[in-house]
């Protein structure tokens, strides 16, 4: 039985990790897990061990919100390195979170650890800080990429498919699309996804609540399962139906208003027309503009940019996020252009990410 140390700090990283572990258990059998991950995985996979730290302790967004976690991260890295030196591990799997995982990989190498290091979901060097490329390539043995264009920047990355295509169980078909077109406006189901972090929710929910008054049909507020016990951050949500399964919400919805993040790509792949709305602290936006050189911030639009396609969906940022702009975008939406690009995205990204990574873990 193999033993892995994983670093999955973000909610999305744990969703991807869960699928990888499912694929591994199905194809190769039992395993042991150490490191940083969601405690729910212990019960799901009947693990004897518990995480050194729960992933919830490290969830933050923006340059300012991350600062208080720096000292905790340094302490965690030291403990993780000691763990790898004191116990037999078959591989270290780092998922996303470059601000943590790159220093961790450096610390492992400095300590003389010979355990193979895998990086799954690579840092977005195509957006900013390309200087990290040689550092990443010299501190990780395998770079498992989920973006087809990563190999334009990394010399040794291997594209293994995008995890969302495996995690989404239902996609809209032509019958679903025709059903949406046949509905009157007051019959349509509208989904609101204000993000998963407290800061995102607080900035977007007042606008989303006011916007929701424009719609007479069913209104769904998508709340991540780990936030279901913290509904007070959303304010008065009595007019919404609360659901937590993002792909199912998007499959059911005729249209969605979404905070920037993984959910925007989920909506595109499921086939639900949407508008992206994003508000951050002014200082975060200022710093981002200094370093990030991209036309768009939504993943689906970024993919379209790299492929030389027109943007898939409208994006509204900062003071442009208001009821008037969002409702106007809904009324003027180009559905035909959206659905044409959805088909392109599915072909572009490919299935099989979890299964391919499980195979790498088994063979290492």
UniProtKB/Swiss-Prot annotation:
Q: Name one Pfam family in it.
A: LpxB
Select a single GO molecular function from the record's annotations and give it.
lipid-A-disaccharide synthase activity
Q: Which PANTHER family did the record assign?
A: LIPID-A-DISACCHARIDE SYNTHASE (PTHR30372), LIPID-A-DISACCHARIDE SYNTHASE, MITOCHONDRIAL-RELATED (PTHR30372:SF4)
- By what name is this protein known? Lipid-A-disaccharide synthase
GO aspect biological process, one term: lipid A biosynthetic process
| Family under the similarity heading | Belongs to the LpxB family.
Keywords of the record:
Glycosyltransferase, Lipid A biosynthesis, Lipid biosynthesis, Lipid metabolism, Transferase
**GO cellular component terms?**
membrane
EC code? 2.4.1.182
Reaction(s) catalysed by this chain's protein: a lipid X + a UDP-2-N,3-O-bis[(3R)-3-hydroxyacyl]-alpha-D-glucosamine = a lipid A disaccharide + UDP + H(+)
Q: What does this protein do?
A: Condensation of UDP-2,3-diacylglucosamine and 2,3-diacylglucosamine-1-phosphate to form lipid A disaccharide, a precursor of lipid A, a phosphorylated glycolipid that anchors the lipopolysaccharide to the outer membrane of the cell.
Gene transcribed to yield this protein: lpxB
Pathway the protein contributes to? Bacterial outer membrane biogenesis; LPS lipid A biosynthesis
Under the heading InterPro entries, the entry gives: Glyco_trans_19
């Amino acid at each position: 039985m193999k033993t892995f140390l994983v670093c999955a700090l973000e909610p999305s990283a744990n969703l991807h990790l869960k699928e990888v572990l499912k694929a591994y258990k199905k194809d190769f059998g039992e395993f042991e897990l150490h490191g940083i991950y969601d405690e729910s995985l212990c019960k799901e996979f009947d693990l004897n061990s518990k995480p050194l730290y729960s992933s919830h302790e490290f969830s933050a967004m923006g340059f300012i919100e991350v600062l208080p976690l720096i000292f905790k991260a340094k302490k965690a890295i030291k403990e993780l390195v000691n763990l790898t030196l004191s116990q037999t591990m078959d591989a270290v799997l780092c998922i996303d979170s470059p601000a943590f995982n790159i220093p961790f990989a450096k610390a492992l190498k400095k300590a003389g650890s010979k355990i193979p290091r895998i990086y799954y979901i690579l840092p977005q060097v195509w957006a900013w800080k390309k200087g990290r490329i040689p550092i990443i390539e010299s501190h990780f043995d395998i770079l498992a990429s989920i973006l087809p264009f990563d190999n334009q920047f990394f010399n040794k990355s291997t594209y293994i498919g995008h995890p969302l295509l495996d995690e989404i169980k239902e996609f809209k078909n032509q019958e679903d699309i025709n059903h949406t077109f046949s509905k009157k406006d007051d019959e349509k189901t509208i989904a609101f996804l204000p993000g998963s972090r407290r800061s995102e929710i607080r900035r977007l929910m007042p606008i989303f609540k006011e916007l929701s008054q424009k719609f007479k049909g069913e209104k769904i507020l998508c709340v991540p399962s780990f936030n279901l016990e913290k509904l007070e951050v959303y304010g008065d949500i009595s007019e919404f139906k609360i659901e937590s399964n993002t792909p199912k919400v998007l499959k059911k919805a005729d249209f969605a208003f979404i905070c920037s993040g993984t959910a925007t790509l989920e909506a595109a792949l499921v086939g639900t027309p949407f508008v992206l709305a994003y508000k951050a602290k002014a200082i975060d936006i200022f710093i981002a503009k200094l370093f990030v050189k991209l036309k768009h911030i939504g993943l689906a639009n970024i993919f379209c940019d790299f492929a030389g396609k027109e943007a898939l969906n409208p994006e509204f940022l900062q003071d442009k996020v208001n009821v008037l702009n969002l409702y106007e975008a809904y009324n003027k939406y180009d559905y035909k252009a959206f659905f044409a690009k959805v088909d392109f995205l599915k072909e572009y990204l490919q299935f099989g990410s979890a299964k391919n990574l499980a195979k790498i873990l088994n063979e290492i």
